[in-house]
Amino acid sequence: MQYNFKVEAFEGPLDLLLHLIHRYEIDIYNIPVAEITEQYLSYVHTMKELQLDVASEYLVMAATLLQIKSKMLLPKHEEDVLDNGDDFIDDPRQELMERLIEYKKYKQVATELKEREQERAQLYTRPPIDFTSLQQEEETNLPLDVTLYDMLAAFQKLMRRKKAEKPVTTRITRQEIPIEQRMTDILKQLEIQGGRQSFYDLFVDDEREIMVVTFLAVLELMKNQQIIIEQEHNFDEIFVSSYTKSA
């Protein structure tokens, strides 16, 4: 059964690289290419496994990273160093580093502009009559605590855990579950659990097909603003809450 799912919040390969740099506390001026290439390719592989619509620029960046990695492995000859002793320009990572720094600045400016726009909207809109509804509107516009890249990392961890727990011999019975049905099941499950549950507890079935559908259902519920995904710190457990619980 095929599930073609496009997630608009994936902003591109530079966004993914910045996410990895932040997640693993990497110095943007001294990127460990081998490590970040491995992590990047792992994310792209997971995106393909989930049948997300992976844009071609992700694959171009993967090729670029592999090329930089191969150049970093080449022996450095003395004659390749510039006469002034500054070998920084010869660093194969230089161009990528500059692109990441520029993109990071762009993202910061875009975030600031969005915040100012929201502030102006609050100042110049009609006087609020119902303060409860206003509070709900503001909460709806708040950014999610967890990015989709964090969700991919959590799914990778989940798959590794399920694989380790799985018996050596298993009998697979294929089930086809529509994403819409799984979305309804998740909302009911959250209601039973008081509106909040661990992300990992949503995946009670070990069958890969159902796990994929569950993950895509979570993404769809996030996009529809029917659930909130929360994580206190990097690598902490992720929790799923319904909007009615968080309001």
UniProtKB/Swiss-Prot annotation:
This is Segregation and condensation protein A. Keywords: Cell cycle, Cell division, Chromosome partition, Cytoplasm. Belongs to the ScpA family. Component of a cohesin-like complex composed of ScpA, ScpB and the Smc homodimer, in which ScpA and ScpB bind to the head domain of Smc. The presence of the three proteins is required for the association of the complex with DNA. Participates in chromosomal partition during cell division. May act via the formation of a condensin-like complex containing Smc and ScpB that pull DNA away from mid-cell into both cell halves. It comes from Bacillus anthracis. NCBIfam families: PRK00104.1-1, PRK00104.1-4. The keyword Cytoplasm applies. The lineage of its organism: Bacteria, Bacillati, Bacillota, Bacilli, Bacillales.
